[in-house]
Amino acid sequence: MKFFVDSANIEEIRELQNLSLVDGVTTNPSLILNSGRNILEVTKEICSLVKGPVSAEVAATEFEDMMKEAAVLAKVADNICIKLPLTLDGLKACKALTAEGLKTNLTLCFSANQALLAAKAGATFVSPFIGRLDDCGINGSELLHEIRTIYDNYNFETQILAASIRTVSHVKEAALSGADVATVPPAILKALITHPLTDKGLQIFLNDWKKTGQNIA
């Protein structure tokens, strides 16, 4: 499973990129707002840091305007992935942009039916929001399983990009469900590394090593 960083913070992305933990990046209007920067400026900088897909989202809700904004975003860099809402106009734009050879990410997916339509529209990625489903008392990981089954049944090439990840458990659920990608906030990605027993075991080893009186280098 690939890891995308869900952030528009350059320093956070650079830190994780230096650890070789980044396969791509996803942004959205909320993350752009938090960055305090111009969308084209910050997206271009992210694309220069990361070789993988960088999702940049249109703000338009109607087809013609989506296409205009997508044309602007596509000029930022070759690794731009146009992010579109999973609506009728979004599906229409996805189909058109895919025909132009552009990567697309249909976002705000909350049902297997929506994911099926995303695949039919030729989306590169579909982004099921598992955290927001959990907020509503619906098992988000179950949706990932459903989408995986449907896609495997029909050999769809659209990749499942698990989004709205709030906890390390969400990451594990995404991996177990067969998601192709998990887009993860930097703090959650770092939290995957830690475990209290790892820290405890390391301290025991260090204490015992000191008792040997040895040096390796």
From Swiss-Prot:
It catalyses: D-sedoheptulose 7-phosphate + D-glyceraldehyde 3-phosphate = D-erythrose 4-phosphate + beta-D-fructose 6-phosphate. It is found in: Cytoplasm. GO terms for molecular function: aldehyde-lyase activity; transaldolase activity. Its main location: cytoplasm. GO terms for cellular component: cytoplasm. Keywords: Cytoplasm, Pentose shunt, Schiff base, Transferase. It comes from the Bacteria. Its EC number is 2.2.1.2. It is an enzyme of class 2 (transferase). The active site is at residue 83. GO terms for biological process: carbohydrate metabolic process; pentose-phosphate shunt. Pathway: Carbohydrate degradation; pentose phosphate pathway; D-glyceraldehyde 3-phosphate and beta-D-fructose 6-phosphate from D-ribose 5-phosphate and D-xylulose 5-phosphate (non-oxidative stage): step 2/3. Transaldolase is important for the balance of metabolites in the pentose-phosphate pathway. Belongs to the transaldolase family. Type 3B subfamily. PANTHER family: FRUCTOSE-6-PHOSPHATE ALDOLASE 1-RELATED, TRANSALDOLASE. This is Probable transaldolase.
